[in-house]
Amino acid sequence: MSTVVHRQTLEVRESVNEPDYDTSIWLINAEIPEWPKRHWVKPIVGDEIEQKPQEAKDAADAEYLKEQKQSRINQLREQYNEALDSRYETRTLLYASYLLTKAMASMEEETVEYLSGLAQWVEDGDVLVEAAEGLVESSTTVEDAQAVSLTLTSWLAADPKVSTRAARKL
């Protein structure tokens, strides 16, 4: 079994059929270094995988950290959105917002008070997500960014359980 590495894409494969690989495209029997692939010089020239200079490694690490932070932020937002969707459909939230605006314009205090609870609850959830995002953004390592969690148990328990049908009847 041979390890082959694509010289342009840095794809690594284990293969038993070395003759199937063109040596101008693939590095055959490559010794895979212990450093991350983002530190490899691309394209591979010659018979060895070379490491980028420190400045290029630092830039690659900074870009990697940025990507990992954004990925974690996206995961946290998805977690929040799934939790919100588990309680209210998007159309219900939009309709509740419309009813709240309409009630405010016509000074229907009871309806405003009822629907404001939902608006405040959604805002409270947004605050939790934004706080977690802030922790991710201030992280200096990938491990720190990935360690940030979002606990929505108390927030979900505080759901005002608003019904647009009930709001229309007020």
Region annotations inferred by a language model:
Residues M1-T3, R7-R38, K42-L170:
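A preference for well-ordered globular domain cores
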